[in-house]
Amino acid sequence: MLRNGNEGMSTIPGFSQIQFEGFFRFINQALAEELDKFPTIKDPDHEIAFQLFAKGYQLLEPSIKERDAVYESLTYSSELYVSARLIFGFDVQKQTISIGNIPIMNSLGTFIINGIYRIVINQILLSPGIYYRSELDHKGISIYTGTIISDWGGRSELAIDKKERIWARVSRKQKISILVLSSAMGSNLREILDNVSYPEIFLSFPNAKEKKRIESKEKAILEFYQQFACVGGDLVFSESLCEELQKKFFQQKCELGRIGRRNMNRRLNLDIPQNNTFLLPRDVLAATDHLIGMKFGTGILDDDDMNHLKNKRIRSVADLLQDQFGLALGRLQHAVQKTIRRVFIRQSKPTPQTLVTPTSTSILLITTYETFFGTYPLSQVFDQTNPLTQTVHGRKVSCLGPGGLTGRTASFRSRDIHPSHYGRICPIDTSEGINVGLTGSLAIHARIDHLWGSIESPFYEISAEKAKEKKERQVVYLSPNRDEYYMIAAGNSLSLNQGIQEEQVVPARYRQEFLTIAWEQIHVRSIFPFQYFSIGGSLIPFIEHNDANRALMSSNMQRQAVPLSRSEKCIVGTGLERQTALDSRVSVIAEREGKIISTDSHKILLSSSGKTISIPLVNHRRSNKNTCMHQKPRVPRGKSIKKGQILAEGAATVGGELALGKNVLVAYMPWEGYNFEDAVLISERLVYEDIYTSFHIRKYEIQTDTTSQGSAEKITKEIPHLEEHLLRNLDKNGVVRLGSWVETGDILVGKLTPQIASESSYIAEAGLLRAIFGLEVSTSKETSLKLPIGGRGRVIDVKWIQRDPLDIMVRVYILQKREIKVGDKVAGRHGNKGIISKILPRQDMPYLQDGTPVDMVFNPLGVPSRMNVGQIFESSLGLAGDLLKKHYRIAPFDERYEQEASRKLVFSELYEASKETKNPWVFEPEYPGKSRIFDGRTGDPFEQPVLIGKSYILKLIHQVDEKIHGRSTGPYSLVTQQPVRGRAKQGGQRVGEMEVWALEGFGVAHILQEILTYKSDHLIARQEILNATIWGKRIPNHEDPPESFRVLVRELRSLALELNHFLVSEKNFQVNREEV
């Protein structure tokens, strides 16, 4: 992307830049803005005034390191100091005081809250302002409405009814005449008529009664309050009534904010100053004028497109943190007012620091932020599955959350791709399921204008003269409301190759339409083929040959790939792998040049400018998704290094490039039905050679508490009644030793909970002691931390966290090595996913003409119907690259150079590989890309030639070890008495309606009876059946109904319907009238 002489130079921006810019704005601007709003707190009775100053605030360096905050479950935060002034009589005191702690963003663009990495994702909302729409009612008459949206999301509507009367609907309850609203806001009838374009329409509808209501502002306010609050009777005008109206209506529905004021001025051609952020009578009258113009055909009949990005704004991390800071300052204000009152009761002399006491008042700030990070929907646990996930998570944009849409109510139109998303929001990358289209990802070149909250995309500016002279081209960033006025060359993304002469006629985009026009008429052009996609979409090679639905699945599944024990970079890639790995910050980059003194698994010592610098490395650290984060040194001792060089590689990176999977030999053919319906057949080589082996770290913790009797729990090795075998790994303190291999059921931490024995359980000696000496005999209950099912592994770390002598938390970290096995999920980069169905011995796998057995067998029927042909190009080119020892980095949409460019590239490389290796089977002209292969079991060739290749296949985090589950007995639901749902609750297997039909179809009455009664909700029968099974007795046949039937009867009774049920005798089929 870089060119000689910096001509038209463009670079991909840092992928985490959006988060950093947002936090930078919060620290530098937002804090000062909120401190400026903090009011002077006055107490006139005692002549005291307290004030905070925005100028010169300071943030101290965090008192703990990031790693310590994670291990000790603390918040990584910085203390905020602000200048304060206290006037007490004639005494003026100035002090710099601490008002609390603010969470600080780390180098990953995340926050550490109570030891957990969390990230705030960007929210996309409807921008404040006014929006017009027209719709037909049931009689076919056009209804015109204008919706005013406030900065807080409150809505008010202006509408013209069938009788051509203008109404304002300020809440769902009531509509109010526009004249009453304008008068209540401070305008009289004369001013209203002077400021509108259609005074005759305004004068046509008020009758004598309405004119009387708007004679004075007070009467208008009373009328407005009565209709707004739905209050009847005779009201009297008062200050408290005005305050309530101000609080409930004007603050919530009329505050437009900076963005809303700009939008309102633009839409209605007003020139109201930007600092006037509230809705004015002039706005309402201009909005009504426009509405009348639409209704009577004198104005522009244009409905606003609510889904256009020019009508949306981004609420970034800066806006959300600023809101919370304002909320915390509001609480601080109330706390200071209470403290002032308390000071005068005690008759002590106040100082600024005593009013903001560190223990009570200043803790408000950090608790406000911790509550926000813990409960706000857009604050999410940072996804650390692999480096790609870490990079992508901060670039998400979501329509969900407070003030936004919900998954259940959002319309199809709001989920759709919009032309204005082009180059700003990726048309591919979104979640599957109920939130499809509501969460998206920013395109790689997009940036957020933090001042106005719009998403901007870069283009090359081309004027007619510059196009002829081929001079330097300037990159311009266009916001969504600006690019409608430009002719944008759409398909002409040849910025990678300046030398190619532009065509005479090019496809272009103008006002959301696609045209074909002369090159001379083009204003701007796109700068890069990847410009329209997110990071996930940009990592898919040959994406142009895939169906968009499969590309969507691929971009989601790459984020679920598990880092493997031995990573390998892809043979066929897109060129974005290096930037993605770099911006994830999982690798260690040299910040200065120097010479390596020594390296080990924990640190690298670097000598630079006469100083010795220690660079710590991450060593087998658990991620939020239980994957293993580990850094390996990649520089030998004594080597001189330069700034920016890679010193150590993180998980899933090789040579500074992203390496999520493995290049394996695949064949597309059916094999004995084992790859039916997306199942995958694999070779045992993938298991024995640790090709798809990954490491996972599980965390188990236990905490000591004080019992209700006041006795403290104790961590100890001395636990009676337990076998020595279960305690074999404990040290003298009762905690498992480092390096121990532990199995299911082993004790990790021994713990005893004291409890007072009941009198009936006393032994004779204990009763004697109690009678003579009055001593209580205490017993202890064993409450140790045991290793649950599926947790076997090696203990790699044990952490003691002791905040006070009685409150001890012990955390045990266990490393598991997981080979690939039947039931694990694997996927390619084209949405081709499958479950391992069988692991074959390598001698039974199909093999090539040179004797190489294939590693995976995919079903060829998975390609034509899904239309993800990119995997065919990738596997064939991968085979050529493997034989030629080459790696390919291919930009998408190469068909813009010539027809069938991808196919020509693949075939030419296969032909080259065939010549180079002297293997004619690599490229056979009769069926290029395919080859005759042999059955490993018989040695006979298969009837048809088979497509073989090297594909990059990922192992996903959906592993069978965490899915497989069985239950004999377990917990039951309280109401229905049926087994609960889910593996985490030790729940049962659901047999739904369709499963019952299937069993009915085979006539298996007894199995059906067991499933629906004994194994489910027949209370008495399920107890007796357990005993009968254990003792080998006949299973009893019970006549009383199951619990779910009783629940149905009760529900019918609640509807006043009595259901009587009887038993039919089996002998003579007579109704037994005795009610069950």
Curated annotation (Swiss-Prot):
The keyword Cytoplasm does not apply. It is found in: Plastid, Chloroplast. Pfam families: RNA_pol_Rpb2_2, RNA_pol_Rpb2_3, RNA_pol_Rpb2_6, RNA_pol_Rpb2_7. It is an enzyme of class 2 (transferase). Its EC number is 2.7.7.6. One of its GO terms (biological process) is DNA-templated transcription. It catalyses: RNA(n) + a ribonucleoside 5'-triphosphate = RNA(n+1) + diphosphate. One of its GO terms (molecular function) is ribonucleoside binding. The keyword Transferase applies. Keywords: Chloroplast, DNA-directed RNA polymerase, Nucleotidyltransferase, Plastid, Transcription, Transferase. Its main location: plastid. PROSITE patterns: RNA_POL_BETA. GO terms for cellular component: chloroplast; DNA-directed RNA polymerase complex; mitochondrion. DNA-dependent RNA polymerase catalyzes the transcription of DNA into RNA using the four ribonucleoside triphosphates as substrates. Belongs to the RNA polymerase beta chain family. In plastids the minimal PEP RNA polymerase catalytic core is composed of four subunits: alpha, beta, beta', and beta''. When a (nuclear-encoded) sigma factor is associated with the core the holoenzyme is formed, which can initiate transcription. This is DNA-directed RNA polymerase subunit beta. The gene is rpoB.
